[in-house]
């Protein structure tokens, strides 16, 4: 069974590699985005996709307003189930860049969804990271106010 290297990585997650995919288990009470970012950095993943499920106790969503080109962030502190976390991996300024969205279920069976800024795991966290083995870069597009794929880089 493969494990992440170094004390920092071992505290955040464990994993098993199958082909070009990694099955990643994130440790309880770990911030999910930071753990996935550290994992991709450790493995040298330059592009790929991420999906997963689990449980969280805190969530910060981000919503983009295209008219103002500004983000509105909102934090929720309650137990929630991740029904879907999905996103992609690329790089920007030679750093890992994760673009993640999440849908969570609340105890009243309503749902929240949006761009994932951060989430603190409170229970299991099971993710699949696929490595595309190619570099995909991003660049800032001032017309959109967003970091978008740049296939020329």
What do the predicted segments below correspond to?
Residues 1-9:
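Single conserved hydrophobic/aromatic residue that forms the stacking wall/gate
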Residues 10-99, 103-153:
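N-terminal intrinsically disordered, cationic/polar leader segments
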